[in-house]
Amino acid sequence: MATTKPYRVLLYYMYTTIENPEEFAEQHLEFCKSLELKGRILVATEGINGTCSGTVEQTEKYVEAMNNDPRFAGIVFKIDEADEHAFKKMHVRPRSELVTLRLEDDINPKEITGKYLEPKDFYEAMKQEDTVIIDARNDYEFDLGHFKGAIKPDIESFRELPDWIRENKETLEGKKILTYCTGGIRCEKFSGWLVREGYEDVSQLHGGIVTYGKDPEVQGELWDGQCYVFDERIAVPVNQKEHVIVGKDHFTGEPCERYVNCANPECNKKILCSEESEAKHLRACSHECRVHPRNRYIVQHELTEEQVAATLEKIEAGK
């Protein structure tokens, strides 16, 4: 493959035993900094989950070091080309679990997990009858892009998913269940939990949406919108054949794929909105957030009280 861009973004995870996550995190942070990588890596006794960016040479050194560590034998890196770093800083943090499911009786994906489907098999499975496609991500991730026909669970975070499944048991019983997430790590646990709950036909997209979008055969087909990623890029394309925008401007309902955080720091909700809507509504998701004394948009643009009042008046008048 011809090298066209100077940077690489690595996305990876592995369920493996790490004896002392705190000590490992400290040492790993120093190692990443020595390579001048930037990113966010989570470490737990159950394994590692990371995204980091650097030059081709820096990321190659990192991949080599990880492959040479027996704990990470067989780890798979999903690699994107980039023009620059995808992060501002480098963080390696110890956690109690890699993905926040907070089950009383935790799932070990090395012992129980759903069937792995490669992109082509997942593509075929999505078209079968009696199949339910469950998006295992957060609501704002779904709103930016998802597989055609996928169910959006009425939840705000991953840890609410088991309760939602239990509440919708009648709809799901007896169906073939397909589940997917960004890179695969959430589905490893979630699909295992579904199996433990008694669902017999549970499959997961191996390698997640990112792998599906790069597959030369399916080329991201049946995906609408873009894939939300947790770095400075915010979104990456998936469907190589056609681009359908499913995101909608929070204020106008117009097609939109531009995410911003609500300007109220106490809210910080992710909202899809155009630059025009952002200015018109002071980058705030509600009236309460617009008039919040710490509204970051007002501070950033040094708006006077008169300017803010005029903006609020226009909104009130529906202009």
Curated annotation (Swiss-Prot):
Keywords: Oxidoreductase, tRNA processing
GO biological process: tRNA modification
Gene3D superfamilies per record: 3.30.70.100, Rhodanese-like domain (3.40.250.10)
Class of enzymatic activity (EC top level): oxidoreductase
Similarity field: Belongs to the TrhO family.
Family annotation (SMART domains): RHOD
PROSITE patterns: RHODANESE_3
Gene Ontology MF annotations: oxidoreductase activity, acting on paired donors, with incorporation or reduction of molecular oxygen
EC number(s) reported in the record: 1.14.-.-
Reaction(s) the record says it catalyses: uridine(34) in tRNA + AH2 + O2 = 5-hydroxyuridine(34) in tRNA + A + H2O
Name the UniProt record assigns to this protein: tRNA uridine(34) hydroxylase
Organism: Bacillus mycoides (strain KBAB4) (Bacillus weihenstephanensis)
Superkingdom, taxonomy of origin: Bacteria
Entry-linked Pfam families: Rhodanese, Rhodanese_C, UPF0176_N
Function: Catalyzes oxygen-dependent 5-hydroxyuridine (ho5U) modification at position 34 in tRNAs.
Domain Rhodanese: 127-221
Residues forming the catalytic site: C181
